[in-house]
């Protein structure tokens, strides 16, 4: 569902290394899992406020620690995730630590 071309372009814009199709597919799968996890946490946030609509603040208020844990879990889950995709996930996780 996430456009592979967009992901590949973002990856290539942030490295001087070559980006394999396999790494793009692996990262797309991981990003989709992250979206599902974030949505579930945001849904819990909306439900606490007795709403049926997920709002931006629900996403912003996602528990950074749970998201970080999931990101690291996914990045270490399989050997199919190559070094570049793994590094991108660690950068995302470290950015979450700031919040």
UniProtKB/Swiss-Prot annotation:
Keywords: Chromosome, Cytoplasm, DNA-binding. InterPro entries: CBFA_NFYB_domain (IPR003958), Histone-fold (IPR009072), HmfB-like (IPR050004). The record marks 12 as: Interaction with DNA. Residues 52-55 are annotated as: Interaction with DNA. GO terms for molecular function: DNA binding; protein heterodimerization activity. This is DNA-binding protein HmvA. Belongs to the archaeal histone HMF family. CDD domains: HFD_archaea_histone-like. NCBIfam families: archaea_histone. GO terms for cellular component: chromosome; cytoplasm. Homodimer or heterodimer with another histone. Dimers then assemble into higher oligomers, with the DNA wrapped around the protein core. It is found in: Cytoplasm; Chromosome. Binds and compact DNA (95 to 150 base pairs) to form nucleosome-like structures that contain positive DNA supercoils. Increases the resistance of DNA to thermal denaturation (in vitro). It comes from Methanococcus voltae. It comes from the Archaea.
